[in-house]
Design a protein with these regions (language model features):
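A structural "domain/chain start" motif
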Residues: 4-57, 61, 109, 143-148
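Surface-exposed short loop/turn segments
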Residues: 54, 63-126
Length: 148
């Protein structure tokens, strides 16, 4: 009888445990200008695992979670009045996280601004900032995970 109670209590405890997850794949289906895709994917996988672990349990044999970076937009806008110039680049990242067959879309935005006086910028397009990109990716992942 004691064994039966022990087995039943163990099964009850196991049924109430939270499911664990694993970030199995990261796909960058969008073009990443001036960046190596392998480095982008590796960084996103680490970020995704960190962010998902704040809400769910992560384990090596958990249910799969996939991340798809499907949109990278980086429009540049600028104003020039006489010797004064201000240029702003907004990096907009969109990710799709698939968990348990459901898709969650997240969007993140980060901005880079350059102001100059009496100095001409070499290139009207601002370079693709890695820190700005990482910030936008993190915001998009946080947005998608918050919808789970």
């Amino acid at each position: 009888m004691k064994k039966l109670l022990l087995v039943l209590s163990t099964l009850t405890l196991l049924s109430f445990t939270e499911p664990c997850y694993k970030v199995t794949s990261v796909i960058a289906s969008a073009d990443a200008p001036d960046m190596k895709k392998e480095r982008v994917i590796f960084g996103i996988k680490q970020l995704a695992e960190e962010i998902v672990s704040e809400k769910y349990t992560i384990c090596s044999d958990g249910s799969p979670i996939t991340v798809d970076l499907f949109s990278i937009e980086a429009p540049t806008t600028g104003v020039s009045i006489g010797p004064f110039t201000a240029i702003k680049k907004e990096t907009i990242i969109k990710v799709k996280i698939t968990k348990d067959g459901k898709e969650y879309i997240g969007e993140g935005t980060a901005k880079t601004t350059v102001k100059s006086t009496l100095i001409e910028l070499q290139d009207e397009n601002l370079p693709f900032e890695k820190t700005t990109f990482a910030s936008a990716v993190k915001k998009s992942l946080l947005d998608a995970v918050s919808k789970m």
